[in-house]
Amino acid sequence: MRVHDIPINGYCGEGFDAVRTEFERNFAERGEVGASVCVYRGGEKVVDLWGGHVDLERAQPWDENTIVIMNSLAKSMSALCTHILIDRGAIDFDAPVADYWPEFAQAGKAGILVRHVLSHTCGVIYCDAAPPGSWFDWPVHIAAIEAQEPAWEPGTNGAYNSIN
């Protein structure tokens, strides 16, 4: 589908044309069906774009009020916050996680670096000891992460994980 065939609406402030260009490329080159993006800078909305369709049949247009599930949003926010802390010198990308969380070093995890966690190469991809529902019981889930052995040598393999 050509980009001019895809309904794209909204606002893109001065100096943010590159955001609109990439947004359009998602449809034209990357097979996006429907999406939206909103960016605030200094408390001001500078980008508010939406386009495409809600359904694969491309029958229902995506609008500014389309609601979607945001999977794994915490990962990007965690990475953003961690990079801010790195930039401020509060965390070292190449330091062991155990420098900041000593109990994490249990079960062969002493060599896992901050970079391994952020790049999904730490090897801690699940928690054998995590009982059902422990996501909602902070001390229990943290203890399960601390007790978990890595599935591989940190930094040697990568896999999506849902514990960070």
Set out the residue ranges of the language-model regions:
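Generic alpha-helical secondary structure signal
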Residues: 14, 18, 112, 116, ...
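Hydrophobic (often cysteine-bearing) scaffold residues that line and stabilize catalytic clefts
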Residues: 15, 19, 70-74, 78, ...
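Residue-level signature of the cytosolic catalytic core of signaling kinases
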Residues: 12-15, 66, 93, 110, ...
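Active-site helix/loop module of the DD-peptidase/beta-lactamase fold
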Residues: 64, 69-73, 85-129, 147-149
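Catalytic-site signature segments of enzymes, centered on catalytic residues
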Residues: 67, 126-164
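Residues at or immediately flanking beta-strands
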Residues: 34-36, 96, 157
